[in-house]
Amino acid sequence: MPGGWVYIMTNGPHGTLYLGVTADIAARVHAHRDGQGSEFCRKHGLTRLVYAEQYEDIHDAIAREKAMKRWKRQ
């Protein structure tokens, strides 16, 4: 099973955050910056990668993404 990444992108300090998962972090960040990533990132101008975690198994990355999305925002 291929590995995966959980990542967070933003548009600036105290800005909008996007949390995602991918098998190829470099290609995914490049796609977001070129406006080819998610519609949410394109709409909010999210081009800065601020956090990334690598996993040996994509299923572990997906589980981590789901857990992080349950975090409370403050």
Say what each PLM segment does.
Residues M1-K69, Q74:
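GIY-YIG nuclease catalytic motif and its immediate N-terminal context
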